[in-house]
């Protein structure tokens, strides 16, 4: 086993025995095999398109789902990977039979999970390239594609698809075995950022088209007496279906982690039993889930090894999987609802205060004139985008301290689960504009980009010339894809922490520093001084 795709990788170098995330050696090898077979499918699909042979939507969806399922904290169940690998291989072979071009050696996949795992040992990420810098760039591309695939899959579930984006994903996968130089691979990394921008745009259209544009909404952090279901992950459609199926049952629905922004969507917040938010970010789930007196539903990624005390109360859906945890399909949450009815629920109302969400692009741009006026009058001196992934590794209290120490004439924009380091801080407002604006989930980086571009247009300058600084935290591969999007857009001076990716070599890092002035975080005091002067 060798895996270094997440920020918490062992010793800052790579996991070699078992993943810090909980991934076993066997699952790691199966995922490596799946990536290899997807790379082969990408090669064949790209050749097919060049020859005018149609690639079906089924193959496109299979590709996005397959790539997404290898992202950190999505699927830990080796048996669930067996049909995925076989379906990808079958799709590859069916297309290959129609293609005249030589697509290289195609891996004949084995039968059982154990056999597939053994087979996967031949395809570690270290085999991407003998040259460590070229391998680093190929890893950046593949990890970026995992983020692209996640957003592409989410968007497709909501009916938003783009055949050109699927074609680009296939072509990017086909790059892995090719002998390319630094310049070409850097170009592909930037292309991945462009692809991710499109994927986030599709997902934004899917979310807002189905559920309306988020509006500023107060969300209780306490509880309401009664039966309860907790929804974690990122999937709005799963939440909507659960809300419909629990209407009139007396069960209250709570969000966890990155589901918090769902409270701002008009078509979700209209349900009276959609009550509040429970807990914080993904890495605290063992403690928080153990104390939740109802059923728990994990959508998309961010699952950790369930503790025995709640293993019987937690369910997965979509691409999420953990061995021994009940998986529900087709949007039928009857089992989850039955479990919630069986469990005690909250005994009494509790008041733990409230937080504000719903400051996506439509809301912020709706008060753009007030924001611009505030900047011109000197009331708002600077904007900070402080967001990204949260995690368990020490050093992430930097983000709490940074936000608390930011001057009163600055505005904090935030998104993704990194916000939980400070989401409940009372920072006040500037001329009626809250100083802490929650833009949404990680994919709502699209909203943040639209806000930045609109402000740049209003001030007739480039985004890099705005009084805006990005202080980002990363953990998994969606953060890689978002970073590549920002670099594709030419955004510079990004501060990144709590540590730099293990898969970035010194030479590749030097390129990023020289061209984009990416820098690691230092201390809140030093960074604020450097930014504000």
Curated annotation (Swiss-Prot):
A cellular component term, taken from the record's GO annotations: cytoplasm
GO MF annotations in UniProt: 4 iron, 4 sulfur cluster binding; hydroxylamine reductase activity; metal ion binding; peroxidase activity
Gene3D superfamilies attached to this UniProt entry: 1.20.1270.20, 3.40.50.2030
Modified residues (Cysteine persulfide): 389
Residues binding hybrid [4Fe-2O-2S] cluster, per UniProt: 234, 258, 302, 389, 417, 442, 476, 478
Cofactor binding, per record: Binds 1 [4Fe-4S] cluster.
Taxonomy, superkingdom: Bacteria
Binding site for [4Fe-4S] cluster: 3, 6, 15, 21
EC number: 1.7.99.1
GO biological process annotation, one example: response to hydrogen peroxide
Enzyme class: oxidoreductase
Primary localisation category: cytoplasm
Subcellular compartments: Cytoplasm
Keyword annotations of the record: 4Fe-4S, Cytoplasm, Iron, Iron-sulfur, Metal-binding, Oxidoreductase
Catalytic activity annotation: A + NH4(+) + H2O = hydroxylamine + AH2 + H(+)
Cofactor: [4Fe-4S] cluster; hybrid [4Fe-2O-2S] cluster
Similarity section: Belongs to the HCP family.
Function (record text): Catalyzes the reduction of hydroxylamine to form NH(3) and H(2)O.
Protein name stated in the entry: Hydroxylamine reductase
């Amino acid at each position: 086993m060798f895996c270094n795709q997440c920020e918490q990788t062992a010793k800052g170098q790579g996991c070699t025995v078992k993943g810090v995330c909980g991934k076993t050696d066997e699952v790691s090898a199966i995922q490596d095999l799946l990536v290899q077979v997807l790379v082969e499918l990408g090669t064949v699909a790209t050749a097919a398109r060049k020859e005018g042979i149609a690639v079906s939507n089924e193959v496109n969806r299979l590709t996005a789902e397959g790539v997404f399922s290898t992202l950190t904290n999505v699927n830990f169940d080796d048996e669930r990977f067996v049909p995925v690998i076989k379906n990808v291989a079958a799709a590859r072979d069916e297309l290959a039979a129609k293609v005249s071009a030589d697509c290289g050696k195609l891996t004949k996949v084995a039968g059982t999970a154990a056999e597939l795992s053994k087979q996967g040992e031949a395809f570690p990420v270290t085999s991407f390239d003998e040259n460590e810098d070229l391998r680093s760039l190929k890893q950046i591309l593949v990890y970026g594609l995992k983020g692209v695939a996640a957003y592409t899959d989410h968007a497709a579930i909501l009916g938003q698809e783009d055949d050109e984006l699927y074609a680009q994903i296939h072509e990017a996968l086909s790059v892995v075995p090719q002998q390319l130089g630094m310049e070409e691979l850097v170009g592909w990394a930037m292309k991945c950022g462009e692809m991710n921008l499109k994927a986030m745009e599709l997902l934004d259209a899917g979310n807002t088209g189905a559920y309306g544009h988020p509006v500023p909404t107060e969300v209780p952090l306490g509880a309401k007496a009664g039966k309860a279901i907790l929804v974690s992950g990122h999937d709005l459609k799963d939440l909507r279906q659960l809300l419909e199926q629990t209407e009139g049952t007396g069960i209250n629905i709570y969000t966890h982690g990155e589901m918090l922004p769902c409270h701002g969507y008009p078509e979700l917040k209209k349900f009276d039993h959609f009550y509040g938010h429970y807990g914080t970010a993904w890495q605290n789930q063992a403690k928080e889930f153990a104390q939740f007196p109802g059923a728990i539903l994990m959508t998309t990624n961010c699952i950790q090894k369930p503790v025995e005390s709640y293993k019987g109360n937690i369910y997965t859906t979509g691409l999420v999987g953990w061995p021994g945890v009940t998986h529900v399909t087709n949007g039928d949450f009857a089992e989850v609802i039955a479990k919630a009815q069986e469990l005690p629920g909250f005994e009494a109302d509790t008041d733990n205060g409230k937080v504000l969400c719903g400051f996506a692009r439509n809301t912020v741009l709706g008060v753009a004139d007030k924001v611009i006026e505030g900047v011109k009058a000197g009331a708002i001196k600077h904007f900070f985008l402080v967001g990204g992934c949260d995690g368990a590794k020490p050093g992430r209290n930097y983000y709490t301290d940074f936000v608390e120490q930011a001057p009163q004439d600055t505005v904090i924009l935030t998104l993704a689960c990194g916000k939980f380091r400070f989401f409940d801080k009372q920072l006040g407002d500037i001329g009626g504009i809250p100083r802490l604006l929650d833009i949404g989930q990680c994919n709502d980086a699209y909203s943040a980009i639209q806000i930045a571009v609109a402000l740049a247009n209003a001030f007739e300058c480039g985004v890099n010339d705005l009084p805006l600084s990005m202080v980002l935290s990363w953990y998994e591969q969606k953060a890689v894809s978002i970073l590549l999007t920002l670099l594709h857009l030419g955004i510079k001076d990004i501060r990144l922490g709590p540590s730099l990716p293990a898969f970035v070599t010194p030479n590749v890092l030097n390129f990023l520093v020289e061209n984009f002035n990416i820098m690691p975080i230092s201390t809140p005091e030093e960074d604020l001084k450097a930014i504000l002067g």
